[in-house]
């Protein structure tokens, strides 16, 4: 694996030190542990997910400071990952636009000096239009709903293939797999999970 981007939910730079190179861009979304920082100056995020319903979550702010999204903003951990998400979504939107234009352009046979031109010059064969594909590798993350807002932005894209690695004692051990599936239901809902784990729209693979 030679990743272009790494979104770290960890507080250390272990991956960067052991496997990293200068061509990889990192985003420590939960902050980074550094020896010269203390409890007052560190930017480490320790919090909970949004547990309130949509109609009250922006009104009931009693426990706002404990929520992860608040701490990310307050501690300035950054949001480079949003640029990566935009790149994924914009690439797919451009692909859909080109496909719609190609399908809407009806081929017309033209005649000139007894020579036949089978297609208009502006016609684009839909089969020649390629959708930009991305692969998301997930290592060592429980997919807990506390990170739902971020994980969903990446996983729920039709041009993203998600490969989730999980620990097992042997080939038949599915204890961790069961927990991951349960957490994914909380992230995207059962219908979306079913669609993405089988059939023509499969985008999620457990490894």
Tell me what each language-model feature is.
Residues 53, 64-66, 90, 104-105, ...:
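A generic signature of intrinsically disordered, low-complexity regions enriched in glycine/proline
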Residues 72-127, 145-146:
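A Trp-anchored, charged/polar loop motif used as the substrate-binding/catalytic surface
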Residues 1-90:
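Extended, H/D-rich, highly charged conserved domains that either
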Residues 22-23, 100, 112-207:
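SIR2/sirtuin-family catalytic core signature
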């Amino acid at each position: 694996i030679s990743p272009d981007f790494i979104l770290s939910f960890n507080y250390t730079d272990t991956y960067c030190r052991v496997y990293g190179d200068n061509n990889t861009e990192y985003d420590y979304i939960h902050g980074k542990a550094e020896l010269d920082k203390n409890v007052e100056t560190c930017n480490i995020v320790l919090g909970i997910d949004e547990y309130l319903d949509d109609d009250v979550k922006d009104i009931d702010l009693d426990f706002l400071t404990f929520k992860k999204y608040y701490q990310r903003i307050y501690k300035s951990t950054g949001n480079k990952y949003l640029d990566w998400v935009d790149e994924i979504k914009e690439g797919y939107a451009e692909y859909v636009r080109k496909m719609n234009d190609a399908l809407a352009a009806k081929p017309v046979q033209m005649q000139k000096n007894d020579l036949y031109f089978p297609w208009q010059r502006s016609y684009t064969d839909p089969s020649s239009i390629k959708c930009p594909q991305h692969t998301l590798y997930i290592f060592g993350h429980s997919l807990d709903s506390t990170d739902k807002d971020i994980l969903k932005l990446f996983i729920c894209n039709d041009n993203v293939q998600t490969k989730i690695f999980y620990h097992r004692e042997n080939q038949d051990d599915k204890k961790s797999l069961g927990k991951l599936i349960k957490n994914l239901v909380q992230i995207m809902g059962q219908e979306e999970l079913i669609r993405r784990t089988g059939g023509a729209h499969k985008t999620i693979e457990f490894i």
